[in-house]
Amino acid sequence: MQKILLIGLLAASSAFAKEPLKKETTSLQTVTAEMATAANAFLASLDAAQAKKANFSFDGDQRENWGFVPRERKGISIEELSERQISLVRDFLKTALSDTGLEKVDAIRTLEAFLAEIERKPDFRNPKAYFTSVFGEPSATGTWSWRFEGHHLALNYTIIDGKAVAATPSFFAANPGEVTQEHKLKGFRPFHAEEDFARTLATSLKAAGREVVFSETPPGEILTAEDRTVKQLDLVGIKASEMTEAQQKSLMDLVAVYAKRHRKELADADIAKVEADMANLRFGWAGGLKRGEPYYYRIQGTTFLVEVANIQNNGNHFHGVWRDSANDFGRDLLGEHVSEDHGK
């Protein structure tokens, strides 16, 4: 029922409610080739004025100018595109996201439409104010980048030599976290797994006498905010190596909820990287453990970070981000790329 309502609310952009992503097992090089093909198809559909808005230099400042709050943005918005062009954006997103990831993108835009309706602020809350940007010249063997972004959503992908993809920063959020108003969307809670898996794990750890709760008072927001670069945050909570096997599995199940927003090839690579860093992995919670109480949690490793805050609106406004302090925007991979070029 909620999925039907979700699609119905986005009828104004019907191309954003098409068939799910086909399940295919391909190499990472095929993923990057598909991204390049989709990017070039989208760019080819634009007129000169649209292309000027959508295509930027790879080396310019705009590539890392990301954010998740309502604001003016560069790129070209859904509102400025034809139905065919919107369909091409959808195809573009399919090269990176799983069916679940696509559903969450739709859910975020659905909630934006819901807020526009109940707040009566259609200019401020606009489900068509989501922008596509391409940085550099997409090719199957090249280095380039792309972003899809709007309020409560920021997807960033950097492709290096057509061989590797960096998929952070990756931000998904929902306001409200759960629709409680008398409305056809009542009960809609698109990030229930991200909340419930974490709360269940934290509750079990606390019940076992583990110091997973590092503060009774949560911070007001995710600490990394919209920073372009992030450093290792203070080590809080408990180490995964100090958990039982069942608790470690629960922690990795939670990590997988975030990773599997992306298509299998990207998700598997992210999960493998986190598993390889299990000795340094930590999980910490701040705030209340009862549903409806404001809370904050983070999972962190050597460079990996998932940070979540559900503080605003009395704990009914979900913010969650996946960061990599070494490789956001592909920095680490780009460093290797430069070193290899200099070695030739």
Named regions from a protein language model:
Residues 1-7:
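Sec-dependent signal peptide recognition
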Residues 8-17:
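Hydrophobic h-region of N-terminal signal peptides that target proteins for export
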Residues 18-98, 102-344:
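A cross-kingdom marker for long, charged
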